């Protein structure tokens, strides 16, 4: 089914708890589309509850792709995402469906529409060696090493940014080239300009923050703490993306007896609210081609189609 106002794909972005999933589901039912995850945490099968993935009933109602498809032990990157998204996009198009990309990870949307820097995969042994040095020598020592090997990257990064400092060193170790040189080389986008309609759902801030708090409480009631306990029992590297999902570090601290459940919930809520605020800023500056709509306007747009 072809709908007016839609080209070859629809992109629905927005902060967490903005009502994106319900909108995408309604659009997919109306247009015969497939909902394609564009959220870096909802790819992890270990975190269905805490990342607010679509329910089993919602996933059964229309095709959903790239949800819960990755183990928490995997350091899933934007490069992995683009590779997987291409396979799904080709599959949906072959079936005549409308691809509906939905999520809040700006880097994934940027990779889809602008292309991705051509950084080759870093071998696991290189990544492990850098992480061991990080644990042994500390982040300041690795930042000093980075300053000697890639002064531009070291000047750009905060001396306490363990993840990005390690990443910059991993790339130099694996390729012999600074990260900036790789970033200057980009692959063609999967969704070039003119091939999609892009929306950013922008709720009123205070209402959004109230929804975030209420949803975190609901996730705890639905078993988020037990979910995190199972994840913690695996003993994974705390620097892995899944281990840094909003709420995971605080709930692990609670499980260790360091803080109360109420304190963990407060931290998880605050981290999620701060992330939502950053999402507004990031999309406004990085992807200005997205049309900003209130949730009411977005629902009206879908109803009009």
Curated annotation (Swiss-Prot):
Q: Name the top EC class.
A: transferase
Q: Per UniProt, where does substrate bind?
A: 16-21
**Entries under InterPro entries matching the protein:** Dimethylallyltransferase, IPT, P-loop_NTPase
Renumbered residue ranges of the record's region Interaction with substrate tRNA: 39-42
Gene3D superfamilies xref list: 1.10.20.140, P-loop containing nucleotide triphosphate hydrolases
* The reaction(s) this protein catalyses: adenosine(37) in tRNA + dimethylallyl diphosphate = N(6)-dimethylallyladenosine(37) in tRNA + diphosphate
- UniProtKB keywords: ATP-binding, Magnesium, Nucleotide-binding, Transferase, tRNA processing
Cofactor(s), by name = Mg(2+)
Give the EC number(s) under which this enzyme is classified. Answer: 2.5.1.75
GO biological process annotation, one example: tRNA modification
Sites annotated Interaction with substrate tRNA: 105, 127
The residues listed in the UniProt record as binding ATP, with positions renumbered to this chain, are: 14-21
The GO molecular function terms of this record are: ATP binding; tRNA dimethylallyltransferase activity
What top-level branch of life does the organism fall under? Bacteria
Role of this protein: Catalyzes the transfer of a dimethylallyl group onto the adenine at position 37 in tRNAs that read codons beginning with uridine, leading to the formation of N6-(dimethylallyl)adenosine (i(6)A).
Q: Which family does it belong to?
A: Belongs to the IPP transferase family.
Q: Which NCBIfam families match?
A: miaA
The protein in question is named tRNA dimethylallyltransferase
Encoding gene per record: miaA
